[in-house]
Amino acid sequence: HVRSRRQRQMCIRDRRVSDPCYERDVWCCGTVDHCKLGTWEAGVLKTDEGEWGTRCAVLAVRHKDTGPDFNVIRLGKVRKVACKCVEQSFEVGVDSGQAGFFDDAFYQNDTVFEELPAPGFAIGDLWYRHVCDITLSKMSAGVLPYGAVSSSGFGDGGYTCYTHADENGVIDFAFIVFI
């Protein structure tokens, strides 16, 4: 089933797609350029993987006014949607069991969390600790200021990001397929 949450305003047109543990210049992450400005929403498709339990199969973000509905990522439809979307040229590498979409201007920026309560996770800088609190929560996914993140399916590996553009060529929907 798909669960969604609202995300904050997007300030710039570039979205970093990455494991939050990576620095900007690592080879296995990338940016999606020319994203629509405004409020974005995030949704995660969780699937029952038998002995592995319930896992995050797909993390998606959409512009709240124009992006495709989250129903398109439901099990069985995600591959069909991928054919209508553009596969991005970068690999979404994962080494910390999580990946997400982040406003590139605020990626790894501790100041977005300065006014919030301290995170429970104790390793890394303030930004990374807050991100880990989200993926270590019961839902294994959620939103943060200027981003969305989820656990990555079965964990570490390389994954694919797809994007959808509106009639003007502006990105209004993107997703990472983990399973």
Q: Where are each of the predicted segments found?
A:
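Acidic, proline/glycine-rich low-complexity IDRs
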Residues: 100, 105-179
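Helix N-cap / beta->alpha transition motif
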Residues: 18-19, 31-33, 62-63, 95-97, ...
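Short, solvent-exposed coil/turn segments at beta-strand boundaries
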Residues: 53, 96, 167-169
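Surface-exposed beta-loop interaction hotspot
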Residues: 58, 62-126, 134
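Single conserved hydrophobic/aromatic residue that forms the stacking wall/gate
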Residues: 1-12
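Extended, charge-biased low-complexity segments
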Residues: 22-81, 92
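Intrinsically disordered, low-complexity, compositionally biased regions/tails
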Residues: 34, 42, 47, 80, ...
